[in-house]
Amino acid sequence: MKIGFIGAGKVGFSLGQFFVQGGLPVTGYYSRHRGSAQEAAAWTGTKQYESLESLVRASDALFLTVPDGAIASVFAQLREFDLAGKQICHCSGALT
């Protein structure tokens, strides 16, 4: 199962690093802050994706590691893509 991260802040960065160290296949990161995605990808030896769609296509599971306030808008964007067979997890929780 190939894992992709939407959001490359502290949670996405740390969780991706943990997964890679555990031998799980991480495809990489997409973030509205390109520099954060580049840094997380470099640190984990993965890829920084230029578009959300390319990350979705490359991944079987998607971790939303964005702030609570961004979950709804990110999910609205995700619904535009073929999500059949994909697992979507979010790592926020103050609101949900």
What are these regions (language model features)?
Residues 1-50, 54:
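NAD(P)+-binding Rossmann beta1-loop-alpha1 motif at the extreme N-terminus of oxidoreductases
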